[in-house]
Amino acid sequence: MNDKKELKLILVAARNQLSSNDIKCLIAYLESDDCEFETSLQISEPKEQPELLELHRLVAIPALIKVSPAPKQIFAGSNIFSQLQKWLPRWSQEGLTKNLGINLQPSKIDSTRTQKEFLLEDELLVLRQENETLTKRIESQERLLRMVAHELRTPLTAATLAVQSQKLGQIDISKLQEVIKRRLEEIELLSQDLLEVGTTKWEALFNPQKIDLGNISAEVILELEKFWRIRNIEIDTDIPSDLPSVFADQRRMRQVFLNLIENAIKFSKDSGSIKITMIHKTNQWVEITICDKGAGIPLSEQKRIFLDRVRLPQTSEGTSGFGIGLSVCRRIVQVHGGRIWVVSEVGVGSCFHFTVPVWQGQNKEQQNLTKG
C-alpha cells in the first residue's frame, strides 16, 4: 500500500530551459523513489499555455507551482531544485501531523500566538522568496531591454548615414536600397530578441558560427567612415593574413567592434590615430586590441566602465563618458567564453583588449561557451 502523501506540481518553462541542470535534477528527483511524495508533475510551455502566466501571476520562468496541498507556493529562478529541497521536509511534517489527527493548538509556553499567526509567518516567508526572485528577474529583464535598445541604435544610425550619403551623391540609389534592406533585417532580428525577453535568457539568443573577424572590422570601419574622415582621424589595422576564423555570433561581434571603434573615434583628438590589432596568441584564442590616443581613463575607473549603468563624467573637452556600450561588450565577450579589459593612461590614451575563441569545428565544448 502506497502511503506517500500526494503532491501536485506545475512546471512552467520554455523548451530550452528544460535542458538546464537544475530542471533536469528537479524532474529526475520527483520521478525517483527517493521522493517522499506521490508526485503529479505537469510540464507546461508558456507559449502553448500563456494563460498560466496570468492565472498564477508569473513574471519569471522557469517556475514551479505547488498546487496542492494548499497553500499554493511558487518557486522561480535558476535554483528551483534547491528551493524545493528546503521545503519538502516541512510539507512532509505538515502531512504527518494531519494524518495522525494532531490538533496544532497554541502551546502554553507561547499562548499569545495562534495557528493563524504561524501560517501567516509561512506565507510571509514565501512572499519574501517570491519578491526576491521577481526583483532579480525584473533587473535581468531591464538589463536585457537596455542592451537590445542600445543595439537597435546601430542599424538606425547606419540607415540614416546611408540616406545622407545618397543625398550627397556619395552612393547611388541601388546601394542605398541594399543598405536599407540589410539594416531592416537587423531590426527584425532585434525585434525577435525583444519578444523573447520574458521567456529566455539573453545568452540563449546567440547564434555562434564560423566567422572572419577581419571582414567584420573592415565593415565597421567603412560604416563609421563619415565620423573619422570628417575629423581627419587615421585608422591603421594590423591583421595577419593567416588569422584563423573564430567561433562567435556574427551580429554580436559586430556590435562589440562598433562600440569599441566608435568610442575610440569619439575620444580621439582631431587628426589623431587609432590602431586595430589582431593576434593569434594560442591555439584557442584570438586577441583583438583597439587603441586610441585620447584622454585616457583613470585607473580607479578602469573596472567600473564595464559595469551596468556606469557612465564616466565628461572629459575636459566636453565629450560625454562611456555609457551602456561597454557593459554590452563585456556581456557579449563573456558569453563567448572570452574576457575584455582596458589598459589606459590619462593623457596618453586607451587600449581595449578582448579575446574570442578560435573556430575548431562546431563541437560540444565550443557550443557550451554560449550557454550561460
Curated annotation (Swiss-Prot):
It comes from Prochlorococcus marinus (strain AS9601). InterPro entries: HATPase_C_sf (IPR036890), His_kinase_dom (IPR005467), HisK_dim/P_dom (IPR003661), HisK_dim/P_sf (IPR036097), KaiB_domain (IPR011649), Kinase_SasA (IPR023527), Light-responsive_reg (IPR052545), Sig_transdc_His_kin-like_C (IPR004358). Keywords: ATP-binding, Biological rhythms, Kinase, Nucleotide-binding, Phosphoprotein, Transferase, Two-component regulatory system. Homooligomerizes. Interacts with KaiC. Participates in the KaiBC complex, whose core is composed of a KaiC homohexamer and 6 KaiB. The keyword Membrane does not apply. This is Adaptive-response sensory kinase SasA. Member of the two-component regulatory system SasA/RpaA involved in genome-wide circadian gene expression. One of several clock output pathways. Participates in the Kai clock protein complex, the main circadian regulator in cyanobacteria, via its interaction with KaiC. KaiC enhances the autophosphorylation activity of SasA, which then transfers its phosphate group to RpaA to activate it. In addition to its output function, recruits fold-shifted KaiB (KaiB(fs)) to KaiC to cooperatively form the KaiB(6):KaiC(6) complex (independent of SasA kinase activity). GO terms for molecular function: ATP binding; phosphorelay response regulator activity; phosphorelay sensor kinase activity; protein kinase activator activity. Pfam families: HATPase_c, HisKA, KaiB. It catalyses: ATP + protein L-histidine = ADP + protein N-phospho-L-histidine. It is an enzyme of class 2 (transferase). Residues 147-360 form the Histidine kinase domain. CDD domains: HATPase, HisKA.
